């Protein structure tokens, strides 16, 4: 299992930050590993939203179908994608902070079945991928110094 957690303090209100993060089509704006996002069901972020997220893979691109499993605006979002290779569990929480908010992105990537033997390599690679995504998230949310 590989896990990456980042927290960003922003001037955006909880409602603004949550709306931006819940619409997974925005992932391509801040995560350099995301090549494209297509909404399959719903309209923007919402409890019934489903997105196909295409990521740069090793040797070829991989499209993951993210389904919204928890949607509690403007505080909590859980989206999950399952493939034959791995399962991705992404939780986004937004907390009020003065006139702005604090956004926490918690990504958990798990190899499936016999592929779990590659967890150590996945952890190392996921840390680098997460660092690049976190930098992009700070940029788009207009991160403030804590």
Regions found by a protein language model. Give the residues of each.
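Hydrophobic ligand-binding cavity/cleft-lining segments
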Residues: 1-41, 146
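Beta-strand/loop substructures that line and gate deep hydrophobic ligand-binding cavities in soluble
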Residues: 80-132
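Generic helix-packing signal
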Residues: 21, 72, 92, 111, ...
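A short, compositionally biased micro-patch
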Residues: 11, 30, 71-72, 97
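Glycine-rich portal/gate segments that line the openings of hydrophobic small-molecule binding cavities
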Residues: 38-86, 98, 102, 132-146
């Amino acid at each position: 299992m590989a896990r990456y957690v980042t927290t960003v303090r922003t001037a955006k209100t909880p409602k603004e930050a949550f709306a931006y993060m819940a619409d997974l089509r925005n992932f391509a704006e801040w995560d350099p590993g995301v090549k494209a996002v297509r909404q399959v069901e719903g309209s923007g972020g919402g409890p019934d939203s489903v997105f196909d997220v295409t990521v740069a893979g090793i040797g070829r691109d991989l499209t993951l179908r993210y389904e919204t499993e928890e949607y509690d605006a403007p505080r909590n979002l859980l989206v999950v994608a399952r493939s034959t290779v791995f399962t991705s569990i992404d939780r986004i929480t937004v907390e009020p902070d003065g006139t702005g908010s604090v956004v926490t992105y918690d990504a958990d990537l798990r190899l499936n079945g016999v592929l779990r033997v590659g967890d150590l390599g996945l952890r190392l690679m996921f840390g680098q991928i997460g660092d690049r995504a976190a930098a992009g998230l700070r940029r788009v949310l207009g991160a403030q110094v804590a």
